[in-house]
Amino acid sequence: RNFANQHGAFSHPLFTALRTDKITVASAGRLLKNYDAHASHLRRLLLKAATIMPESAVGFILENVRNEYGNGIDSERHQLQLQDVAFSAGVSREDYKSYSVEKSVKTFIKTVTPLYFPIEQHTAKHAPQFKKQTSALSKAAIAAGAITATELMAVEEFKALQIAFRQFDLQDHIWFDHVQVEEEHSGDSIALALYFLTRHQSFEAVEFGLRGVLDANIHLYDGLLATIKL
């Protein structure tokens, strides 16, 4: 956690903007559409990451995945909760659908994919340089570091987003239960990272995944910031 806190992602201007800037309805829609795009991709990557974990490490991921998908109740999926925040803020369904995903957010998605799922046949196709860098590292440990970075940053993201949506009197919307949920998930992800650090001494691999996602988050935050600065 201390390692991650020292990274520039934690002090990205996005967080100040979310806490202080006036956000229009259109900006709120663009912001949430882009957050939706990144979160939807990460949910799928979590499922992939679970498939390369040792049996004894899978449990650290399952609760997170199940919660994201509404604990088995389709209407409680987190994606639907996010979209309801947008609609409750006054964004029309037509406008929400029409908003584009920022180039920087697409760069984030492309960058984090091999960190969550760093198997040879994937990285050889999509990230050959990554394959060379990680040839001697535990692929599951890289994914563990990536997941840990995501969950640590998610806590900060939701705290700032909750403040931003006070402007729409939506700070108590169920989607912002994520502030507590992500605190719990960050504990699970840190436990996952510690599993590889203590049982497999995979420090270099965990750090590679952790740092890689933190670096990628700069692209994500650049894209999200652009949506509220237009």
Where are the language model's segments positioned?
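Non-heme di-metal
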Residues: 1-230
